[in-house]
């Protein structure tokens, strides 16, 4: 599913406001017939589509954002499960390369990637893990009313699936298919919850994630929400060259 909500000065209308992508990441909404009901893993799609619906309603009511917003995700009610430590992963009937090709749109100039991140013990541009932008932390504080929380990543989390390395989850897999900056929004819990667990969706958490993406979209279209410091990024590349190798399969056979 891909939804384009045109902005008043969006590029789809001939304008020059930047385009934000909101990607809902998941294996599936359900694990039928093994499990009955919606699974925890589907929260990313639910949040992304909630954001899309709200943007469409706002647009119809005359509250039009400056820039285009493209929301993309996929719906699968009967996805398989996979063994994974410490709890089972939800698999998907489509591979990550296909998912990225369909969901990571080249028109997206920055991406908010929303994914359930409950099945672990912890709560990028061109292969670099960059500092979290102050603008995004300001939005998070405003939306949640709490201090911003940042989840830890390892370098291998931003490498493509299929290279036999452990990945936190698919939250930053869009980085492997774009040159745009990608920020992961993790829907997390205090205790580990398997992606295939039913009855584990917390409506308030999904709503906060959707509202965060919407608030970022409002600011991004005006140019007042930076995902990273462009001068620092340029100097980083000048000193250490690019890290695009991490967006590839490397020397995997």
At which residue positions do the language-model features occur?
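Soluble metallo-hydrolase cores and metallopeptidase-like ectodomains found primarily
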Residues: 1-32
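Solvent-exposed alpha-helices and their adjacent loops that cap or buttress functional pockets
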Residues: 8-16, 39-41, 61-65, 102-106, ...
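Alpha-helical metal-binding/catalytic segments enriched in His/Glu/Asp
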Residues: 22, 32-73
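Glycine/charged-rich beta-loop-alpha catalytic/anionic-binding loops adjacent to active sites
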Residues: 25-37, 121, 194-195
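Acidic, glycine-rich active-site loops and adjacent beta-strand->loop/helix elements
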Residues: 26-29, 69, 73-80, 191
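Short acidic, glycine/serine/threonine-rich loops at helix termini
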Residues: 34, 80-87
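A glycine-rich helix N-cap at a beta->alpha junction
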Residues: 86-112
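Active-site-adjacent substrate-binding region
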Residues: 100, 110, 116-250
